[in-house]
Amino acid sequence: MANLRITLVKSLIGRPETERKTARAMGLKKLHRQVVCPDTPVTRGQVQKLAHLVRVESIE
């Protein structure tokens, strides 16, 4: 199963609470921090919600 490397590239300051909570749930706390998550529908939904704030790379 593939994984996704997700990097927070824009600040969460001034963002709605739901976006901040989603980023926090994914483990993204500070700018330019990376997390590796499994490529599941749940993760894809979270990435879609934060698409304007994160960079996503597929890794194997």
Swiss-Prot record:
Keyword Transmembrane: no
GO molecular function: structural constituent of ribosome
Single GO biological process annotation from the record: translation
SUPFAM superfamilies, alphabetized: Ribosomal protein L30p/L7e (SSF55129)
Signal peptide: none
CDD domains hit by this protein: Ribosomal_L30
Domain of life: Bacteria
Annotated GO CC locations: cytosolic large ribosomal subunit
Keywords: Ribonucleoprotein, Ribosomal protein
Family listed: Belongs to the universal ribosomal protein uL30 family.
Subunit structure: Part of the 50S ribosomal subunit.
Record HAMAP family: Ribosomal_uL30_B (MF_01371_B)
Name of the protein this chain belongs to: Large ribosomal subunit protein uL30
UniProt source species: Moorella thermoacetica (strain ATCC 39073 / JCM 9320)
Lineage, uppermost ranks: Bacteria, Bacillati, Bacillota, Clostridia, Moorellales
Gene: rpmD
